[in-house]
């Protein structure tokens, strides 16, 4: 649909029509009709009760749609206010993304849905009304017409009750059908214009203005001849309805001919003989005016432009395209109206140089012989040009060339009389054509590629399928490993009952009140913050399905997944509306959505995880997230999660921390009893661990960090170690304390220590040589030659064969690639400087013999 009046900064004046009916109960004055007048315009639009209107919203291109139920003036306040009670209709883009799949089909572009929600506010201010709109009601079995002439017509056939789509009730459908049959609500009533002119002169002036505005290079300077209401702004259409139908058409036709003939003295005259001379190129700064051109027939008579005229549009780009417009107007004796028939033909002419054009003109002047250019030859030339352009151009240019050829073929099927009256604009040039033929027939010297150059425009997206089904766990340890995974969703969330109840009560109260709020949740990693909030949202969604709480939209963003803090606006907007926009534009749209009072919008619950990663120097992202819920009428609930407990006091500005409010919650680290309860609830009835092993890992993790994720990872690693020991010959049994101790040592030890323990004997000997050289020299740096001498001495002491210089250099390079050593990036060989990337104590701890 085209853009509406909300983009135009004009002032509209609303006034009542008729006498009011008093409503003493509500202190209202009820009206049945109102008048809307745009400032500095004489056109008025009358809107009555029962009509559908467009109302200003967040998106100017897609305003809200509603049906007027009542017009009244509220006198309860100090200043009376013009108000209206409406019945809302929603577009498909206004429905939450998570519920759009319930429609089961692709909606039409002009389809709206009857909004069946009794809790939705239906009182608006009449100043937010843009104008009337036509809405057609359809039965469920009817098909939405696709060939509708008016783009402003909307169709409704289903209703939306915030849960699913249903057909319109018989009462609503009958009322809408009755409204369509009523003639008073079909079109807006416009007031009479102040300026009244002669009908014939109006018709002539409009046609002249339309011709000048459609062919002039300065279209912005042309103004309309008659005042048009800004509420009825539409794109210009070339149809029968654009030309006013007046009774005296012969007089207007005569005036049009006189006005066009009067311009011949000031404009360039061009006469075409049967052999057309090559047109001259226009200067870049020249304004090309169009004048009626006389066509000379064989008998020498010149026809008037009004009977049959042909205008040549010369493109400013002197390359290929010359557009020929032939306009015929015939008077219909039955309906007494002017019926224009417009024929557009695009002819491609090969580009000529100035020398060839001069020879052509010199050769044409003395001869004056008559030659007729056949359309078949022009089609052959077009085909050759198309073949060359197809090799050089992309798919878009190919489509344009096919359209030009199709238009030439259509013009070829016209009658002989029309073909004789059209002057010949295309002259064959044998030399360029022969060159083009040789170029087209010459084979390519490049090696043909095996893959095609052009890919399919609409590839079908597919998800990779599994060739083999997922194997079921074959042992108790495998099943326990699946249950202990961090991403596995448990049936219940133990040890966080109080925090769950506090968050649930906070969000539920905001949903019931229809207000916004913010809660700050902090705690060390692995204490169940995100899992608890997700469980709260899941329970609230189930309650919304049973009508225990109002429906809401849920959006979650994670600061860890964002490349830049301002991208959080883009993620929120895309998940809410499905639109893609830049960060600044998305911030403006979200501010308009949350800060303005949207009566029919659902409450939005926003979860912002890893809030501390959204910190910026100006802190504008955090400020906006905490400021939006504080606005009046903003139905936004923000749940912010961060790992820093004192984030508001430590890094936030005062203006940001004040917006955060006093609703805060802190998740304490898990104790050993809570960790043990979490492990038992995960394992359920499986006997995969000994009781002492579970007690040991719970106490170890609780003493260090209290991170439940770390506890689950240690238990999963212990099951792998237990299976590995079974493969070595031991009996398969539950995980013991020894298995857990080995897993704990791996988890809490450094990765460098683990890498040193897994090094080869030669690499460990090289590390010992580095430690010996550092102790000898007292420095933390040594050359490769010094370390090699120490390595050879250590090998002789232990009775091992010492490696060669090349083997030792390879060992040094390997340890440097593992980042255990800091090696100089040069080719100094023996003088290469080497340093340790870990402490000497860690190296000695990893190399000690157990």
Curated annotation (Swiss-Prot):
Q: Kindly state which keywords UniProt assigns to this record, in alphabetical order.
A: ATP-binding, DNA replication, DNA-binding, Magnesium, Metal-binding, Nucleotide-binding, Nucleus, Phosphoprotein
Which CDD domains does the entry link to? Answer: Cdc6_C
Ranges of Acidic residues composition bias in the record: 395-404
Q: Matching Gene3D superfamilies, A to Z?
A: 2.30.30.490, P-loop containing nucleotide triphosphate hydrolases
Tell me which residues make up the BAH domain: 45-171
Q: Which PANTHER family match?
A: CELL DIVISION CONTROL PROTEIN 6-RELATED, ORIGIN RECOGNITION COMPLEX SUBUNIT 1
Q: What is known of its domains?
A: The BAH domain mediates binding to dimethylated histone H4 'Lys-20' (H4K20me2), which is enriched at replication origins.
Protein name (record): Origin recognition complex subunit 1
């Amino acid at each position: 649909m085209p853009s509406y009046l909300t983009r135009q900064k004009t002032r509209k004046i609303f006034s009542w029509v008729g006498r009011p009916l008093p409503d003493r109960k509500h202190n209202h004055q009820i009206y049945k009709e109102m008048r809307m007048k745009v400032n500095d315009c004489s056109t008025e639009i009358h809107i009555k009760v029962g009509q559908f209107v467009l109302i200003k919203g967040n998106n100017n291109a897609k305003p809200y749609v509603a049906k007027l139920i009542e017009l009244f003036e509220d006198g309860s306040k100090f200043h009376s206010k013009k108000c209206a009670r409406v019945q809302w209709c929603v577009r498909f883009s206004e429905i939450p993304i998570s519920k759009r799949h319930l429609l089961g089909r692709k909606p039409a572009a002009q389809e709206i849905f009857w909004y069946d929600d009794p809790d939705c506010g239906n009182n608006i201010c009449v100043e937010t009304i843009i104008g009337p709109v036509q809405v057609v009601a359809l039965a469920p079995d009817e098909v939405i017409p696709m060939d509708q002439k008016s783009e402003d017509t909307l169709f409704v056939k289903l209703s939306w009750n915030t849960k699913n789509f249903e057909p319109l009730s018989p009462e609503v459908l009958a009322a809408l059908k009755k409204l369509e049959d009523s003639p008073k609500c079909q079109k807006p009533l416009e007031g009479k214009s102040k300026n009244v002119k002669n009908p014939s002169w109006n018709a002539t002036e409009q046609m002249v203005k339309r011709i000048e505005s459609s062919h002039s290079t300065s279209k912005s300077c042309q103004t309309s001849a008659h005042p048009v209401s800004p509420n009825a702004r539409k794109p210009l259409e070339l149809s029968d309805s654009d030309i006013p139908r007046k009774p005296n058409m012969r007089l207007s036709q005569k005036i049009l001919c006189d006005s066009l003939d009067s311009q011949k003295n000031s404009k360039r005259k061009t006469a075409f003989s049967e052999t057309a001379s090559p047109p001259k190129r226009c200067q870049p700064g020249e304004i090309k005016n169009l004048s009626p051109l006389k066509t000379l027939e064989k008998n020498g008579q010149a026809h008037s432009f009004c009977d049959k005229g042909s205008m040549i549009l010369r493109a400013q780009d002197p390359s290929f395209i010359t557009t020929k417009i032939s306009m015929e107007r015939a008077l219909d004796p039955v309906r007494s109206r002017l019926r224009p028939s417009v024929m557009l033909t695009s002819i491609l002419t090969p580009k000529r140089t100035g020398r060839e054009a001069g020879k052509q003109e010199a050769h044409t002047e003395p001869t004056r012989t008559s030659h007729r250019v056949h359309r078949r030859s022009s089609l052959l030339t077009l085909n050759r040009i198309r073949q060359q352009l197809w090799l050089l151009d992309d798919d878009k240019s190919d489509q344009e060339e096919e359209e030009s050829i199709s238009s030439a073929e259509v013009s070829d099927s016209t009658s002989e009389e029309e073909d004789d009256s059209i002057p010949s604009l295309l002259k064959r040039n044998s030399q360029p054509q022969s060159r083009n033929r040789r170029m087209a027939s010459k084979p390519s010297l490049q090696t043909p590629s095996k893959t095609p150059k052009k890919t399919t425009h609409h590839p079908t997206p597919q998800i990779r399928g599994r060739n083999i089904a997922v194997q079921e766990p074959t042992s108790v340890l495998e099943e326990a490993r699946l249950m202990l995974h961090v991403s596995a969703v448990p049936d219940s969330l133990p040890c966080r009952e109080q925090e769950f109840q506090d968050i649930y009560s906070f969000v539920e109260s905001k949903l019931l009140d229809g207000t916004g709020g913010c809660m700050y949740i902090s705690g060390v990693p692995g204490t169940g913050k995100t899992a608890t909030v997700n469980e709260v949202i899941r329970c609230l969604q189930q309650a919304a399905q049973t009508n225990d709480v109002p429906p809401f939209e849920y959006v979650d963003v994670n600061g860890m997944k964002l490349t830049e803090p301002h991208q959080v606006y883009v993620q929120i907007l895309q998940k809410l509306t499905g639109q893609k926009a830049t960060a600044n534009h998305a911030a403006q749209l979200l501010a308009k959505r949350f800060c303005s009072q949207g009566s029919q919008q659902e409450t939005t619950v926003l979860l912002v995880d890893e809030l501390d990663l959204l910190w910026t120097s100006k802190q504008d992202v955090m400020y906006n997230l905490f400021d939006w819920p504080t606005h009046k009428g903003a139905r936004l609930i923000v749940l912010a999660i961060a790992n820093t407990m004192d984030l508001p006091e430590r890094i936030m500005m005062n203006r940001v921390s004040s917006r955060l409010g006093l609703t805060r919650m802190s998740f304490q680290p898990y104790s050993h009893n809570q960790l043990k309860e979490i492990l038992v609830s995960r394992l359920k009835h499986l006997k995969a661990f000994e009781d002492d092993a579970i007690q040991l890992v719970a106490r170890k993790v609780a003493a260090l960090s209290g991170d439940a994720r770390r506890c689950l990872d240690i238990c999963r690693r212990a099951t792998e170690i237990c299976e590995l020991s079974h493969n070595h010959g031991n009996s398969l049994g539950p995980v013991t304390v020894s298995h857990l101790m080995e897993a704990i040592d791996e988890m809490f030890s450094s990765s460098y220590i683990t890498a040193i323990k897994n090094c080869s004997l030669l690499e460990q000997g090289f590390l010992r040589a580095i430690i010996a050289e550092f102790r000898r020299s007292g420095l933390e740096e040594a050359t490769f030659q010094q370390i090699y001498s120490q390595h050879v001495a250590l090998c002789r002491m232990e009775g091992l064969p010492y490696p060669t210089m090349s083997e030792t250099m390879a060992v040094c390079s390997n340890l440097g690639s593992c980042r255990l050593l800091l090696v100089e990036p040069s080719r100094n060989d023996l003088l290469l400087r080497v340093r340790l990337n870990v402490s000497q104590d860690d190296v000695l701890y990893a190399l000690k013999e157990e």
